[in-house]
């Protein structure tokens, strides 16, 4: 499967951003500071 060259950096930036956002919301919800 050949992905477009724009798709690779997009996933490389979006996936960590979603992971960090979900982790941040998880910490905020559980008040683990």
From Swiss-Prot:
GO terms for cellular component: chloroplast thylakoid membrane; photosystem I. GO terms for biological process: photosynthesis. Pfam families: PSI_8. Disulfide bonds: none annotated. Coiled coil: none annotated. The chain crosses the membrane at residues 6-26. It comes from the Eukaryota. SUPFAM superfamilies: Subunit VIII of photosystem I reaction centre, PsaI. Keywords: Chloroplast, Membrane, Photosynthesis, Photosystem I, Plastid, Thylakoid, Transmembrane, Transmembrane helix. InterPro entries: PSI_PsaI (IPR001302), PSI_PsaI_sf (IPR036357). It is a single-pass membrane protein. It is found in: Plastid, Chloroplast thylakoid membrane. May help in the organization of the PsaL subunit. Belongs to the PsaI family. NCBIfam families: PS_I_psaI. This is Photosystem I reaction center subunit VIII. The lineage of its organism: Eukaryota, Viridiplantae, Streptophyta, Embryophyta, Tracheophyta. The gene is psaI.
